[in-house]
Amino acid sequence: MSTPKPDRRTFVKWGIASAGVPLVADALGALAEAKAEPPAAATDVSDGGERGGSTVSLGSGVQLYYKEDWLGAPWLNGEPAILLHGNLETHEIWYGWVPRMAQQFRVLRPDLPGFGRSTAPRDFEWSLGNYAKLVANFLDAIGIASAHIIGAKTGGAIAMQFAATYPQRTRALVVASGPFTSVAPGTDDNSQQVRLGSAATKEEMAYFDKLRDETSAETRRGVGTMMSNFNLESLLPRIGAPTLVITSDRSKLQSVDTVLRYQPKIPHSRLLVVTSDAYHVAVANANECVTNVLAFIRETKQA
């Protein structure tokens, strides 16, 4: 039986198009029912236009900067959601997600080590496994046992590595344009028009150019080498959390057919294909992504 082509509103489950089919019940095996943890003490940071940022020490010289947002009732504390950005950028790329996500979740957006205001470990061995370990260390540092893990681009690959390595710490997984295998060296040096799509404004592209230019040469080399030499295929069956994979129908990072070769290997996964010529869908199609992510997580909790 041939695999049907999904449209922008179609979820694909195990490679078979199925619009809105609930996740199977055992998909919730890795979704721990736990109370939201209170935030741990951290150092407040006030710098530039950012307010309310904090840093935590992860050892080995790592000072990790992160932003935390909760816009729900002040007497409540939402379930934690960790948002992991991609290469050549910072936590700021999630600006389109915070207003709605933070009404329902305690949203934590770290600058991954080596990016933004976070330092990389001394003598860091650049690998997805080491980045996943640093994310786990971050959760430990702020007192979080498990969280919804959401990643974009390189952050999506790190998120998959984390979910496979720490299944009991992953409530749900969202991968927005995250590659499953090596990408060509220099892929993230593509023009912002390619990354953000034809609808991107000059001001938006200039801003992302600024984030790229502010990334250190050491980080660019390290992450570039890491992303041109990895393969997550053998780890995908180990991901136990309900998973939503998001891509675009005209992505220049990886085609829908390429995604369909790997996404079904994640046991409890769905694929959402949005109509876009950008491959950074977390930014270019933020509103549609958030709408579907909120619905997806809500469904997994109700199943």
Positions of PLM-derived features:
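Hydrophobic, aromatic-rich cap/lid helix
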Residues: 207-234, 250
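Conserved HGGG/HGGXW glycine-rich cap/lid loop of the alpha/beta-hydrolase fold
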Residues: 62, 69-117
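N-terminal secretory signal peptides and thylakoid transit peptides that target proteins
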Residues: 2-19
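Catalytic active-site module of serine/aspartate enzymes centered on a nucleophile-bearing elbow/loop
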Residues: 275-303
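Active-site loop/oxyanion-hole signature of alpha/beta-hydrolase fold enzymes
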Residues: 67-70, 109-150
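Conserved hydrolase catalytic core segment
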Residues: 145-183
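Short beta-strand/loop motif that positions the catalytic acidic residue
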Residues: 239, 245-247
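C-terminal segment of N-terminal export signals and the immediately downstream linker at the start
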Residues: 5, 26-59
